[in-house]
Amino acid sequence: MNLNATILGQAIAFVLFVLFCMKYVWPPLMASIEKRQKEIADGLASAERAKKDLDIAQAEATDHLKQAKVEAQAIIEQANKRKAQVVDEAKAEAEAERNKILAQAQAEIDAERKRAREELRKQVAMLALAGAEKIIERSVDDAANSDIVDKIVAEL
């Protein structure tokens, strides 16, 4: 056997084996590898999309939280303003009531003072009349007394 013929036979067998493999074994193997690459790429793309969706959801949640805090702060400020307004209104009402009571009391005091002055004037006039009556030692009738007292009160 010739070594060259053996090598040539082995080369032909190898070429036939390679052709057979390229025709029948290689395409399904490559299809399987490409399918697996596609699945991996789709999985990575899906993971990337999920990460982006998560980032978007977190950003939206943060925005909603900030908006809720702003709204809560606005509600608190509005409540504080309303509280201050109610307190101011209550103070104003109390001040008005106090002024009303003071004015009423002052009016009562003035009326009482006026009545006391009138009473005092009448008593002073009666005392003066009694003193004058004792000095003169004569009796004046009650109608004349009343006229004299009224005149004296009017003069005082």
Swiss-Prot record:
Indicate yes or no for the key word Repeat: no
GO terms of molecular function: proton-transporting ATP synthase activity, rotational mechanism; proton-transporting ATPase activity, rotational mechanism
Major localisation: membrane
Name the Gene3D superfamilies for this protein. F1F0 ATP synthase subunit B, membrane domain
Q: Where in the cell is it found?
A: Cell inner membrane
Q: Does the keyword Ribosomal protein apply?
A: no
What would be one Pfam family of this protein? ATP-synt_B
GO cellular component entries: plasma membrane; proton-transporting ATP synthase complex
- Could you tell me the membrane topology recorded for this protein? Single-pass membrane protein
Query: Which keywords, in A-to-Z order, does the entry hold?
Result: ATP synthesis, Cell inner membrane, Cell membrane, CF(0), Hydrogen ion transport, Ion transport, Membrane, Transmembrane, Transmembrane helix, Transport
**Residues annotated as transmembrane:** 11-31
Q: Which InterPro entries match?
A: ATP_synth_B-like_membr_sf (IPR028987), ATP_synth_b/b'su_bac/chlpt (IPR002146), ATP_synth_F0_bsu_bac (IPR005864), ATP_synthase_B_chain (IPR050059)
Functional note: F(1)F(0) ATP synthase produces ATP from ADP in the presence of a proton or sodium gradient. F-type ATPases consist of two structural domains, F(1) containing the extramembraneous catalytic core and F(0) containing the membrane proton channel, linked together by a central stalk and a peripheral stalk. During catalysis, ATP synthesis in the catalytic domain of F(1) is coupled via a rotary mechanism of the central stalk subunits to proton translocation.
Annotated NCBIfam families: ATP_synt_b, PRK05759.1-2, PRK05759.1-4
Name recorded for this polypeptide: ATP synthase subunit b
Protein's organism: Sodalis glossinidius (strain morsitans)
